[in-house]
Amino acid sequence: MQRETMPVDVLFVGGGPACLAGAIRLMDLIAAHNASGAAPKLDELTIALMDKGSEIGSHAISGAVLDPTALNELIPDWKNQDPTFLERYVEEETFLTLTSKFSLPAPLMPPGMEDHGSPIISIAKFQKWLAAQAEARGVMLFAGFAGTQLLYENGQVTGVRTGDKGIDSNGEQKPTFEPGIDIQAKVTILGEGPRGTLSRQLINRYGLDKDSQPMVYEIGVKEVIEMPPGTVKKGEVILTFGYPLDLDTFGGAFIYSLAGDRYAIGLLVGLDAKDPAMDAHYLLQKLKNHPTIRAKLGAGKVVKYGAKAVTVGGWPSIPKLYAPGAMLVGDSASFLNPGRIKGIHLSMKSGMLAAETAFEALKRGDSREEVLSAYKAAVDASWIRTEMEPMKNFHPAMEKGVIGGMASVGLSLLFGPGEQKPFLADHEHMHKNAAVRGQHPYPERNDLVYDGSYIVDKLTDVYHSGTKHEEKQPAHLHVVDKNICATQCAEEYGNPCTRFCPAQVYNMHYDEGTHRNELHIDFSNCVHCKTCDIRDPYQIITWVPPEGGQGPEYGIL
């Protein structure tokens, strides 16, 4: 098949904060270098950035209270450059411990969680703003292009192949067929977010994770709630711990006030949860039904929804960050501080350091592994390590359970983290159904009244996500053996994908031909969170990109 090729000098894959910050930093370095008159002159370079969303920010979701450290370094006068992403500044912080009926405020915020004066932002708007900054500097932006394969030559990464468009559900070419293009790059920087497709290809091909702990995740589900005028407290941040999670499941919740009479509410739940019936969307609705939370938000209505995996392994989960011709940045490389549940600033800094390494590679005309290894040295010498390394045993501490884990973390803050403790991949923690509750099937859920406005079911929230996929295309969720779903998984785990998916993609339907329940995949519901790929106990589900430009339209999340 003939494919169009596009040569570029540096290709950033992913339109998140890591790659956008990296692209901006690289363009600034090139401009300063050329203005200085130093040799070699780096003119007529092509720096490109591609993203699978219909536009930059379409798939962006985060809390988010921003630690502005990296942004201050990247664009020192950002406050004077029309920061359209800014919702509020934090003015009031509360930390609540919840039981099923009561709430207990803490006298102080936990160490590292204080955010007074920090910006409350929309991550989607932030990425659009960064994209405009990058484009103004000359970066070529390509939205709606999903990377499906890395390109190689003589053992070195040489770019990315984008996905074909116009393939029907049988794998045949439609009249609208367009073959993907080969974007050939001297340096490829991968920042696809958690569980990135190309990032995993790179890690697997070069064994980049052989000396690191597994990447582990939480699922974050978030809604934006529109409130009656005058009922939103300006700059309010509420963090909660406890209900609706049990003491074996790590996670927590947040409520942030936004501009325009809106609150954001989100819940994070560890994907290492032992209970196969864990359902983050259902737990979010239970949280909203808590008396304290309902008193705050109950007069509102849900207007936006999204879900995404969050990397929480921290420092020990960071793989080798470079390979011949390529580097990993952001969530694709586990740049998040699990103790603070903050990663935007770390992702941005990783992208900036990768850009500095790419800049040196361009000057030398050499992107071999030996040259790109400077990226890892730069990370180790930066405040990324200063912030992340002391929390290196946060995740293994939480594997003990919430109470024991918090005690271990407290001791490590006082006396240091000690030796690195190993931990397991998330799916290895799931207990078989009978071990959790001693019976089959899952218990009925009749404790919530879904009003379609404040307490909403999954399909209503899928609508609020704005997700769209062309139905007549191959499913982008690949299950190796559906017979396992109908037999072994049904018996041992009760088909947990029907619960842990926050978009009701997976359903078991009775089949008259086989006389048993069979797996049905409603891939058009998918919000690209990657939970199934991570939590499936048999690891037989693989998420791959659908046609570029499809998926959720988060906009304000």
Predicted feature descriptions by range:
Residues V8-A48:
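N-terminal Rossmann-like FAD-binding beta1-loop-alpha1 element of flavoenzymes
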Residues R25-L29, L42-S100:
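N-terminal FAD cofactor-binding segment of flavoenzymes
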Residues E491-S524, K530-E553:
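Iron-sulfur cluster-binding cysteine motifs and their immediate structural context
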Residues F359-V456, K468:
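C-terminal helical "tail/cap" subdomain of flavin- and related membrane-associated enzymes
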Residues K41-D43, A124, K128-W129, Q133-A295, ...:
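Predominantly flavin-linked oxidoreductase catalytic cores and closely associated redox partners
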Residues A18, E55, R195:
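Conserved Rossmann-like nucleotide-cofactor binding loop
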Residues P40-E44, S334-R340, M352, E356-V402, ...:
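Active-site-proximal substrate-binding core of FAD-dependent oxidoreductases
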Residues A307-P338, D461-K472, C485-F500, N507:
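FAD-binding beta-loop-beta segment adjacent to the flavin cofactor pocket
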